[in-house]
């Protein structure tokens, strides 16, 4: 398969084809089985996090170093010229990309990654999250994890639970899975946190089946993947939050009627939406999912920075 990802900006999931997603998943699996310590030899990657991050930043930096590359950058914008001296984001990007072979950026402003790609002088920009907009590399590790546990990306029943309105991870993953065949979605959320209309309209246009379900228990027996998210307390008053939260807590008891192959995923951090008794079940896979972030990001970096592998 030709590597169409070479020197490509990775800004949003809709801009990646099914073939490109499959190439990343395949490459992640190969790297997990057989480490490749020289794929980024003599390469420098700028890791610029204008917003707090733990898993994404550390997994990117681990991925770069395990491939033999070097990292420059920062994990807070507070001490940069952007914050201290009023430098524009466009100017900052132009300077930093002149030092590096790729530019990984997280930023609180929606559209910041797209802006960076316009001022990077051809250096590939990888979006590590831009506000509530897109988080494409989380989607890549999610896809790899689904493939690793199910052996396929077609013909799957997938449920998303919790905050489907503001959760950028569920938007991106829905758009990615919509590129595959035989996918059926279950959207389980309170009405105030329902999946946005534009996502449902995209699925309608593609003829992809989805159901709006009030209870997890109604969907669990049919599922291959149960993707949990945190309901954000700050969006509700105390009484409303208590009611909503209690309806979307997963326990080991909920999983008793589940298929043997069902895996529970979560972008983390969890608060109390997954009971700790789920951790000991064979369905729990969220910690392995987080670990897979290193392999998915290794695969992406290797493909973006190498014409052939």
Swiss-Prot record:
It holds the Pfam family OTCace_N. The keyword Lipid biosynthesis does not apply. The keyword Transferase applies. Disulfide bonds: none annotated. Pathway: Pyrimidine metabolism; UMP biosynthesis via de novo pathway; (S)-dihydroorotate from bicarbonate: step 2/3. L-aspartate binds at residues 85, 168, 230. GO terms for molecular function: amino acid binding; aspartate carbamoyltransferase activity. One of its GO terms (biological process) is 'de novo' UMP biosynthetic process. Heterododecamer (2C3:3R2) of six catalytic PyrB chains organized as two trimers (C3), and six regulatory PyrI chains organized as three dimers (R2). NCBIfam families: asp_carb_tr, PRK00856.1. Catalyzes the condensation of carbamoyl phosphate and aspartate to form carbamoyl aspartate and inorganic phosphate, the committed step in the de novo pyrimidine nucleotide biosynthesis pathway. Belongs to the aspartate/ornithine carbamoyltransferase superfamily. ATCase family. This is Aspartate carbamoyltransferase catalytic subunit.
